[in-house]
Regions:
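Phosphate-coordination loops involved in phosphoryl transfer and adenosine-cofactor binding
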Residues: 54-60, 168-170, 286
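Glycine-rich phosphate/diphosphate-binding loop of Rossmann-like nucleotide-binding domains
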Residues: 65-80, 162-248
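Rossmann-like adenosine-cofactor binding region
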Residues: 218-304
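Adenosine-phosphate binding glycine-rich loop
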Residues: 286-287, 292-334
Length: 334
């Protein structure tokens, strides 16, 4: 018989209503589901370094066609903490049948016979989304192409919710030179807009947020603004005057002859420690800074690491619990 804690957890899972669903976009979750997942994660937080035998006998497969540290390890840890087991493929183009030109659809069909849930990362969004339709178990996107990274956004939203107790009314600057390829920035902007935050999207105009993303965001919340081509001084002044949170979704710098040019424009979005300190002293306000990680040299002053404004490492402590909540909400338990 379940003890009271497990009964509470089961009731929360049932209330979320996401059992046997895929998570491909943050928009697959309603606002209510997101907030209920936060509450479930909060309930599971005490076990993120121990173990609950809720999913004993259940298996997670993690298939990563691109490098990952935090996403893959936190999902595998989450499954283990819930009492389940994991099977992992981190170099499929070398060590799996994909190296023999097996289609992703066939691979997903096969792996779904072994697993109760799959976490997939793949560089081609269309190919990945098509492959999901062949799966006989639920699939979670660990990031597909440049479109979205829904579980990273879910983690960062949960971190803000833990910090402020709310999302509604927060003023969040999503900032990077390149918002075309910032998949977490897209997921985060969708969810923040839906949950009632004021969103500023700061980038270079030539790398602005894709039109289809902006169109979808503005259908949700027409209060989202795009800000282009600021200098480093203007960028930090904007943060000082407007931000509760600076959200850095990271970006992949190009290689070759474009690399040096990109480093120079990255410098315009450098978060200065002095800006954070000035807000603290003059406004008695903490402007929080968070980053999806991994970060690149030149994105922020590393003194922020030791300040009260730092949220990116704090988020790691929340990452297992929120992914425990998501996995449990999808698999369910008796």
């Amino acid at each position: 018989m379940m003890n009271t804690s497990l009964k509470t957890i089961k009731n929360m899972v049932d209330d979320i209503g996401f059992i046997n669903h895929n998570l491909i976009s943050i928009n697959d979750l309603s606002n209510k589901m997101i907030l209920e997942l936060f509450k479930l994660a909060n309930c599971l937080q005490p076990w993120y370094k121990s173990r609950l035998e809720i999913l004993s006998g259940k298996h997670m497969a993690t298939l990563f066609f691109q490098p990952s540290t935090r996403t893959r390890l936190s999902f595998e840890t989450a499954m283990t903490r819930l009492g389940g087991t994991t099977i992992s493929e981190t170099t499929p183009l070398i060590s799996s049948s994909a190296a023999k030109e097996e289609s992703l659809s066939d691979m997903i069909k096969v792996v779904s016979q072994y697993a109760n849930i799959i976490v997939l990362r793949h560089p081609n969004s269309d190919e990945a989304k098509n492959a999901v339709t062949y799966s006989d178990c639920p699939v979670i996107s660990g990031a597909f192409g440049h479109e979205e990274h829904p579980t990273q956004a879910l983690l960062d939203l949960y971190t803000l919710w833990q910090t402020y107790g709310k999302i509604e009314g927060l003023k969040v600057c999503i900032a990077t030179p390149d918002l075309i390829h910032a998949r977490t920035g897209h997921s985060m902007a969708y969810a923040l807009a839906r949950l009632g935050a004021k969103v500023y999207l700061l980038s270079k105009k030539e790398y602005r947020t894709p039109n289809f993303v902006m169109e979808n965001i503005r259908k949700i919340n027409n209060n989202t603004e795009e800000i282009f081509d600021l200098s480093q001084k203007q960028f930090n002044e904007f943060i000082y005057n407007n931000a509760d949170v600076v959200y850095l979704p990271g970006c992949s710098a190009p290689k070759g002859e474009d690399a040096e040019k990109f480093k120079q424009i990255m410098n315009d979005y450098f978060v200065q420690y002095e800006t954070i300190e000035k807000a603290n002293k003059e406004k008695n306000k903490i402007i929080y800074v968070t980053h999806t990680l991994p970060r690149r040299k030149g994105e922020m002053d590393l003194r922020i690491d030791k300040s009260s404004a730092e949220l990116y490492f704090k988020a790691i402590a929340y990452s297992v619990a929120i992914r425990m909540a998501l996995v449990l909400a999808i698999i369910g338990f008796e």
